[in-house]
Structure formats: C-alpha cells, structure tokens
C-alpha cells in the first residue's frame, strides 16, 4: 500500500525533498483535493524550512490513506526522477531503474557482481597502461552505500542506462601551432570513459561556433533522460577567456567561453540532466608562458576579448542557485597559467587524470579523485602546472562504481 511505503520512507523523504518539488507537490495535492487551501497555507505559513514543510506535509498526507499517498508518489515519480531514485520509488512502489537508497539492505542486495571491463590491449592510454579501470568489488560497493547512502548521487541500472560523454579536441588550427600529441589524449580519454560505461562522441577541429552547435545538440540528446550523469572533455589551445576554436588568431579571436558550456547544460537548457552530475574536463592553457622542448597549449592573450560585466556576474549568481547545479569543472591549470603537452606522450594533465581515474574510481568519489590528481602536481618541476576544480555545485558525492 502507498501509505505504508511513505511511512517507511518518511525520514529519508523529509531529508531529501527540494524546495521546487515541495512547492509543486503542494499545488498538485491542492488540485487533486488531497489537501484543501487552508491545509496547504498552513504547511507554508507555519514552517520556515523545506524540511519542516516536508515533515508537515507527509504527516498530513499519510493519515488520509493509500489513495492520497499514491497521488503523492506518482507526482514525485513523474516530476522529480532524482528524488524518486533517492527514495527508491516508482508509481507502482517498485525501485525503478535507480538503486534504492532508503535502507542499507535494499541497497546492498541491488548490487550485481561487477562485470569485466572490455579493453583493447593494443590501444595504450597516454600513461602507457592498457586502459584498465579497477572494478569496484561488491564488498566495497556495499561499504560505500551503507556508510553514505543519503549523500550519494543515485546510479541507474547498468542494463538500461544510456550514459553519454562528449569529447571535443582541436589539434589543427588555421593560424596557430598544431597540438602534436592530441591523438594520444583522445585515445586515452575515450577508452577511460567507455570503460566507465559511457558512449563517447568525439568531435575534432571545430570553430567556436561549431563547438556551440555540438554542445546544443548534445544537450538535446534523448539518452540523457535514461542516464544518471555525463562527462564533457575539451582539449585545445586556450587563453584566459576560454577555449580556442580552429580559426583563432590574436587579430580575429575564435573563443568558446566557459560560461557558455555551463549555460547550455544547465537545468533550463538541458532538463534531462537535472539533478544529475555533469563533469567538465578542460585541457587548455589559461594564460601565456614560454616553453622549450615541451609544447604548451597556449596562444597569445588577445586584447580584443571582453570579460563579463559586473551586471552579468550578479545575474549569474542568482541563476546558479536555481539553474546551475550538479556541475564540477576540472581544468588543467589555474587562471593565467600554462598547461603542458608532450608531442608523443600527450598532455601531462590528461595522462595523470586517466591514471588516477583508473586506480581510484573503484573506491573514491570524483571530487576526491580530482584532489589526488592535484596532489600529484604538488611538487613543481620544470613543467609546473596546478589543475583546479571550478564552479563546483555538486550537492552529493559522485561515485562511478565501475563494473556496476
């Protein structure tokens, strides 16, 4: 019965509800006459926080019986798939595609034994390995879910999810040097993402306008509806203001600004990825510095490009709270500094990122893996750079659970 389901999940329900969903649910329950106007206004008026409103709401709905509770469950499943996954709900009270996070026994039994990752030994990554990703053992998966079940992004069932990743790599340019070694990075990142369960789209040698077009098309892919996350990888020359397109020159800039990437994948423009982690990897310089044997992914900083105005920053800050969420960007260097690439071994940053993802995805969340990558750069040498995470709006830990 639906009322029994809500009783069992009451605590997690209260802890997990978001402001947008609680307001929509109140409207739905008013429209379907589960609540009258006075009851709805009382929930809003007498409770200051979302948790208090949720507690008052569920305690009002459960006594009204199974039909009222079923209306509540159906609304959540149809309007907030992330919350439904967190609660282990579906319209018929099954767990659906998401792994149930409500109680540890349900979670642990839902994990199948990890399946072998298929690799091609003839295709080495930039680190020189065979591209093997360590699988997450059943015991390790159980341990993580048991300890952090309410703080982890839910993952969809491996047999039915449709994870997508996009790689955009510019190697050839009209007016600036070729990025020798970029093919090594493409091969390594493609294998890594495939081994983590993503179907990978690779696009090469694009203008800023072409990159925008590809991003828009990617954001509208229907597969995102049945996916739990996405990765986007950009590898090109770069300057402080963004990523260089193939036609870039100091005289005629051809730049994809980082803000455009976030905007095209936010909740407004890509609702299918709402409440799902979106990881952006950027291998590009963000300033200028001389190099000798090693090449640097950098061109001269153009004075023709304007930075966002103060008004734009203020507007963006408001939007972030409502539209931009569940992002993390990992850049190969801090602002104004260079990123290094070897002509035969590929980029230093991409190589170390692949190594660390292969080694630690089985036991660490993405933010912790990125910290380990930064730690590997802690002692500077003649090719010093320091990767940095930016615009992090992940609200939960993103574990990849390779093999599951």
Curated annotation (Swiss-Prot):
Please list the residues that make up the propeptide.
1-119, 298-316
Chief site of localization? cytoplasm
GO cellular component, alphabetical, reads: AIM2 inflammasome complex; canonical inflammasome complex; cytoplasm; cytosol; IPAF inflammasome complex; microtubule; NLRP1 inflammasome complex; NLRP3 inflammasome complex
Q: What gene name is given for the protein in this entry?
A: CASP1
| Expression induction or repression | Transcription and translation induced by M.tuberculosis and a number of different M.tuberculosis components; EsxA is the most potent activator tested (at protein level).
| Protein name as catalogued | Caspase-1
Q: What does this protein do?
A: Thiol protease involved in a variety of inflammatory processes by proteolytically cleaving other proteins, such as the precursors of the inflammatory cytokines interleukin-1 beta (IL1B) and interleukin 18 (IL18) as well as the pyroptosis inducer Gasdermin-D (GSDMD), into active mature peptides.
Covalent cross-link Glycyl lysine isopeptide (Lys-Gly) (interchain with G-Cter in ubiquitin) as placed by the record, residue numbers: 134
Which organism is this protein's natural source?
Answer: Homo sapiens (Human)
Against SMART domains, the record matches this protein to: CARD, CASc
What does UniProt say on post-translational modification here? Answer: The two subunits are derived from the precursor sequence by an autocatalytic mechanism.
Q: Write out the tissue specificity statement of the associated record.
A: Expressed in larger amounts in spleen and lung. Detected in liver, heart, small intestine, colon, thymus, prostate, skeletal muscle, peripheral blood leukocytes, kidney and testis. No expression in the brain.
Q: Name one GO molecular function term.
A: endopeptidase activity
Phosphoserine is found on: 302
Q: Identify its protein family.
A: Belongs to the peptidase C14A family.
Where does this one sit in the cell? Cytoplasm; Cell membrane
Q: How does it assemble?
A: Heterotetramer that consists of two anti-parallel arranged heterodimers, each one formed by a 20 kDa (Caspase-1 subunit p20) and a 10 kDa (Caspase-1 subunit p10) subunit. May be a component of the inflammasome, a protein complex which also includes PYCARD, CARD8 and NLRP2 and whose function would be the activation of pro-inflammatory caspases. Component of the AIM2 PANoptosome complex, a multiprotein complex that drives inflammatory cell death (PANoptosis).
**Catalyzed reactions:** Strict requirement for an Asp residue at position P1 and has a preferred cleavage sequence of Tyr-Val-Ala-Asp-|-
Show where the CARD domain sits: 1-91
Instruction: Name the top EC class.
Output: hydrolase
Pfam entry (one): Peptidase_C14
């Amino acid at each position: 019965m639906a009322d029994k389901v809500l009783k069992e999940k009451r605590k997690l329900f209260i802890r997990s509800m978001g402001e947008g969903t609680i307001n929509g649910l109140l409207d739905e329950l008013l429209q379907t006459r589960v609540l009258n106007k006075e009851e709805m206004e009382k929930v809003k008026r007498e409770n200051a926080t979302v948790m208090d409103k949720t507690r008052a709401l569920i305690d009002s709905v459960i006594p009204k019986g199974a039909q009222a509770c079923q209306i509540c469950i159906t609304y959540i499943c149809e309007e907030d798939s992330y919350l439904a996954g967190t609660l282990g709900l579906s319209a018929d009270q099954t767990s659906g595609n998401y792994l149930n996070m409500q109680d540890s026994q349900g979670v642990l039994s839902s994990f199948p034994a990890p399946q072998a990752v298929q690799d091609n030994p003839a295709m080495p990554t930039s680190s020189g390995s065979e591209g093997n990703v360590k699988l997450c053992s059943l015991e390790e998966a159980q341990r993580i879910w048991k300890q952090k079940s309410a703080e982890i992004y839910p993952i969809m069932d491996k047999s039915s999810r449709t994870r997508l990743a996009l790689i955009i790599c510019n190697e050839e340019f009209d007016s600036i040097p070729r990025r020798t070694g970029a093919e090594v990075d493409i091969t390594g990142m493609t294998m890594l993402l495939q081994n983590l369960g993503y179907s990978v789209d690779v696009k090469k040698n694009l203008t800023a306008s072409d990159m925008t077009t590809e991003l828009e098309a990617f954001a509208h892919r229907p597969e995102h509806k049945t996916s739990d996350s996405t990765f986007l990888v950009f590898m090109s020359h770069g300057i402080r203001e963004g990523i260089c397109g193939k036609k870039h020159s100091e005289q005629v800039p051809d730049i994809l600004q980082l803000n455009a990437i976030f905007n095209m994948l936010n909740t407004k423009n890509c609702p299918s990825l709402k409440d799902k982690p979106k990881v952006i990897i950027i291998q590009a310089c963000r300033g200028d510095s001389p190099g000798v044997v090693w090449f640097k992914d950098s061109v001269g900083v153009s004075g023709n490009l304007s930075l966002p105005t103060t008004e734009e920053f203020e507007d963006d800050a408001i939007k972030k709270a409502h539209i931009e969420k569940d992002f993390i960007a990992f850049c190969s260097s801090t602002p104004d500094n260079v990123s290094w690439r070897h002509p035969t071994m590929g980029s230093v940053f991409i190589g170390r990122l692949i190594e660390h993802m292969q080694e630690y995805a089985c036991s660490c969340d993405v933010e912790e893996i990125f910290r380990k990558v930064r730690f590997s750069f802690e002692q500077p040498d003649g090719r010093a750079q320091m990767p940095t995470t930016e615009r992090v709006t992940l609200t939960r830990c993103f574990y990849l659970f390779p093999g599951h």
